[in-house]
Amino acid sequence: MQKYKVYINNEVKIVEENWQDFCSKFIMVEAAGGLVFNKHGDILMIFRNGKWDLPKGKLELGESVEECAIREVEEECGVSGLEIESELSKTYHTYNLHESDILKNTYWFLMTTESEQKLTPQTEEGISDVKWCSEKEVEDNLNNSYPSIIDVFNSL
């Protein structure tokens, strides 16, 4: 039986029961995002709602997960010239929105860019900062992040 790792209120739950039954309790949201390296080996991170995070967002109708991941990184960070190198992982986390329980399934991709343009946070999405982070900065930032984001880094 396949096991699924789901973050509920930032606590891990391993779902071994029927996955479809578990999912039926939630509104499912498909999303995609990127762990992006620049040519200097720095990693792109965003600061949203008081936490360090990676750029990601919801799939639009007719869009592939790869297209979504690139679009979301571009929109949330103002970066261009993105190339997908590989798929990294999938994460699952729940949240409550307007009294509805949501289960977000996020597809994560390893990306690179040669771009050195000025980064621009998408403030209307609650993003107050976007920056290229050294390995040490990433380590520090992950102390104020989400467990699912730490999982993405661990999948490298």
Task: Indicate where each model-derived feature is located.
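Acidic, metal-coordinating catalytic segment for phosphate/diphosphate chemistry
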Residues: 1-33
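Acidic surface patches and DE-rich sequence motifs
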Residues: 7-9, 38, 47, 96-97
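Alpha-helix C-terminal capping segments
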Residues: 13-15, 46, 153-156
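Short, contiguous, helix-prone interaction/anchoring segments in small proteins
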Residues: 23-53
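Unchanged
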Residues: 59-147
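Charged phosphate-binding loop/patch that engages nucleotide di/tri-phosphates or the phosphate backbone
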Residues: 144-156
